[in-house]
Swiss-Prot record:
InterPro entries: RuBisCO, RuBisCo_large_chain_AS, RuBisCO_lsu_C, RuBisCO_lsu_C_sf, RuBisCO_lsu_fd_N, RuBisCO_lsu_N_sf, RuBisCO_lsuI. Substrate binds at N123, T173, K177, R295, H327, S379. Residues 1-2 form a propeptide. The basic functional RuBisCO is composed of a large chain homodimer in a 'head-to-tail' conformation. In form I RuBisCO this homodimer is arranged in a barrel-like tetramer with the small subunits forming a tetrameric 'cap' on each end of the 'barrel'. This is Ribulose bisphosphate carboxylase large chain. RuBisCO catalyzes two reactions: the carboxylation of D-ribulose 1,5-bisphosphate, the primary event in carbon dioxide fixation, as well as the oxidative fragmentation of the pentose substrate in the photorespiration process. Both reactions occur simultaneously and in competition at the same active site. GO terms for biological process: photorespiration; reductive pentose-phosphate cycle. It is found in: Plastid, Chloroplast. Mg(2+) binds at K201, D203, E204. It comes from Abies magnifica (California red fir). Heterohexadecamer of 8 large chains and 8 small chains; disulfide-linked. The disulfide link is formed within the large subunit homodimers.
Length: 475
């Protein structure tokens, strides 16, 4: 190579691999009100200092890459970079710590959970310098949350649409979840709704299979709920699952549901994706449809304590993306969920302002500035004996959903629904009279069986059913 064409690595900028902490670990940084804040549980590889691991997370989830590049000089890294501003040990864990990272707002597209997650929970989770990484919480500033529509309607508007106040709403997932014909499926819906439930539900894996195509199911379910409404004088709903293989097909199903005049549709927001979910949520607000959200696939993401993402983050993301209901565990049923942690993210779904409370897993104060709330849905392995605890734990603004706990009644679906309705109203009345459901719940249920043979039969069937396993989602 001639001297005239020879280049040197030292010309222009200093190339090579740098320690992340030199640029991205900034313990002196004062966070701004507009920053998005993240709390990561970090498990570094042996020999990697905590400061370097925390800085690597900040770098790889914002502006950094593995080497210095000359185009760094064409922008202001100081303006756009993520910053690891604090590190604290995890009690009882020698090799883990919490890294707090602040991201400037300009890194994220307005109104896009998809873009937010692509950065914050993207490639950094496969970074070799880390043995494991878990996103425990996010602080979404009002400057960013106001760029989202949020839930299509919210809790108060839903109650006004249904004309139902002062108690939790009751639901039921139709079983068997797969295999029924559309007409038999509609028959099961009708029996549950006329028996006293407010809602019935498609199971999350019911889309449009050979045994029951979606259009047939929609028609028979609409017929069932209109018939039940006429008989009971109450507004009824069935969560028609619009989830599909393409956004176009999903929207076609939502449009048909609206044409049928039903009050609510459903989406599997994690398997369907945030882009599809936000699209559907916007349509639901514009067209007066409530939107029920199922969280199928969440445990793949959130169940491991050391890696992935806590459900409280997925709950915040759903509130921004849009949904009027979301499944949130039961505390007392067959699915994972510790009480204080569960109530922490239930408050994040429902309330306007939630204070930092590490005892409930809430790492940051969250201000939703009047974004509509989401009703938490308790579903999975629950029955009439759980009703006092569910009423006491979740309060009025919730949906209590009994699938097997309705359809497993020895006398059929309608008596199963009646048993749940009687149990709920007995618990609400007892609570309103000042009785302690935590201590007197079983007595309240037994008293109600005296004037409800349906409830008495249900109590006899499920008196021995318990799911007593230790939770792994603890603080």
């Amino acid at each position: 190579m001639s001297p005239k064409t020879e280049t040197k690595a030292s010309v222009g900028f200093k190339a090579g691999v740098k320690d992340y902490r030199l640029t991205y670990y900034t313990p002196e940084y004062q966070t701004k009100d507009t920053d998005i804040l993240a709390a990561f549980r970090v498990t570094p590889q042996p020999g990697v200092p905590p400061e370097e691991a925390g800085a690597a997370v900040a770098a790889e989830s914002s502006t950094g890459t593995w080497t210095t590049v000359w185009t760094d000089g064409l922008t202001s890294l100081d303006r756009y970079k993520g910053r690891c501003y604090d590190i604290e040990p995890v009690p009882g864990e020698e090799s883990q710590f919490i890294a707090y990272v602040a991201y400037p707002l300009d890194l994220f597209e307005e109104g896009s959970v998809t873009n937010l997650f692509t950065s914050i929970v993207g490639n950094v989770f496969g970074f070799k310098a880390l043995r494991a990484l878990r996103l425990e919480d996010l602080r979404i500033p009002p400057a960013y949350s106001k760029t989202f529509q949020g839930p299509p309607h919210g809790i108060q508007v839903e109650r006004d649409k249904l004309n139902k106040y002062g108690r939790p709403l009751l639901g039921c997932t139709i079983k068997p979840k797969l295999g029924l014909s559309a007409k038999n499926y509609g028959r099961a819906v009708y029996e549950c709704l006329r028996g006293g439930l407010d809602f019935t539900k498609d199971d999350e894996n019911v889309n449009s299979q050979p045994f029951m195509r979606w259009r047939d199911r929609f028609v028979f379910c609409a017929e069932a709920l209109y018939k039940a409404q006429a008989e009971t004088g109450e507004i009824k709903g069935h969560y028609l699952n619009a989830t599909a293989g393409t956004c176009e097909e999903m929207m076609k199903r939502a449009v048909f549901a609206r044409e049928l005049g039903v009050p609510i549709v459903m989406h599997d927001y994690l398997t369907g994706g945030f882009t599809a979910n936000t699209t559907l949520a916007h349509y639901c607000r514009d067209n007066g449809l409530l939107l029920h959200i199922h969280r199928a696939m969440h445990a793949v993401i959130d169940r491991q304590r050391n890696h992935g993402m806590h459900f409280r983050v997925l709950a915040k993301a759903l509130r921004m993306s849009g949904g009027d209901h979301i499944h949130a565990g039961t505390v007392v049923g067959k699915l994972e969920g510790e009480r204080d942690v569960t109530l922490g993210f239930v408050d994040l779904l429902r309330d306007d302002f939630i204070e930092k409370d590490r005892s409930r897993g809430i790492f940051f104060t969250q201000d939703w500035v009047s974004m509509p709330g989401v009703l938490p849905v308790a579903s999975g392995g629950i029955h009439v004996w759980h009703m006092p605890a569910l009423t006491e734990i979740f309060g009025d603004d919730s949906v209590l959903q009994f699938g097997g706990g309705t359809l497993g009644h020895p006398w059929g679906n309608a008596p199963g629904a009646a048993a749940n309705r009687v149990a709920l109203e007995a618990c609400v009345q007892a609570r309103n009279e000042g009785r302690d459901l935590a201590r007197e719940g079983n007595e309240v249920i037994r008293e109600a069986t005296k004037w409800s043979p349906e409830l008495a039969a249900a109590c006899e069937v499920w008196k021995e059913i318990k799911f007593e396993f230790d939770t792994i989602d603890y603080l």
